[in-house]
Structures are given as C-alpha cells and as structure tokens.
C-alpha cells in the first residue's frame, strides 16, 4: 500500500505542476 502511495503522490504533484504551467502560459 505504501509503495503505491509513494508512486501515486509524485504523479499527483506532477499533474498539479503541469496545470500551473498551462495557466501561466
């Protein structure tokens, strides 16, 4: 379970950063 969270959390942050970049552009 923890391994899944460790893989899931970075992907969520990546998605949020991508959304922020799209808004800036």
Swiss-Prot record:
Sorted UniProt keywords? Antibiotic, Antimicrobial, Cytolysis, Hemolysis, Secreted, Toxin
- Give the protein's recorded name: Grammistin Gs F
Taxonomically, which superkingdom?
A: Eukaryota
One GO BP annotation of this record: defense response to bacterium
Q: Where in the cell is it found?
A: Secreted
Name which cysteines form disulfide bonds. none
Q: Hey, which family's this protein in?
A: Belongs to the grammistin family. Group 1 subfamily.
Q: What's this protein's function? A: Thanks to its abundant amphiphilic alpha-helices, it may integrate into membrane phospholipids, leading to lysis of the membrane. Its hemolytic activity is inhibited by phospholipids, but not by cholesterol. Has antibacterial activity with a broad spectrum against various species of bacteria including both Gram-positive and Gram-negative groups. Also has ichthyotoxic activity.
Q: In which tissues is it expressed?
A: Expressed by the skin glands.
MF-aspect GO terms: toxin activity
Q: Does the keyword Secreted apply?
A: yes
The record's note on quaternary structure and interaction partners says:
Exists as aggregates of 3-4 molecules.
The coiled-coil regions, if any, are: none
List the GO terms this entry assigns under cellular component, sorted alphabetically: extracellular region
Q: Its principal location?
A: secreted
């Amino acid at each position: 379970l923890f391994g899944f969270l460790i893989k899931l959390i970075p992907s969520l942050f990546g998605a949020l950063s991508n959304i922020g970049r799209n808004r800036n552009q």
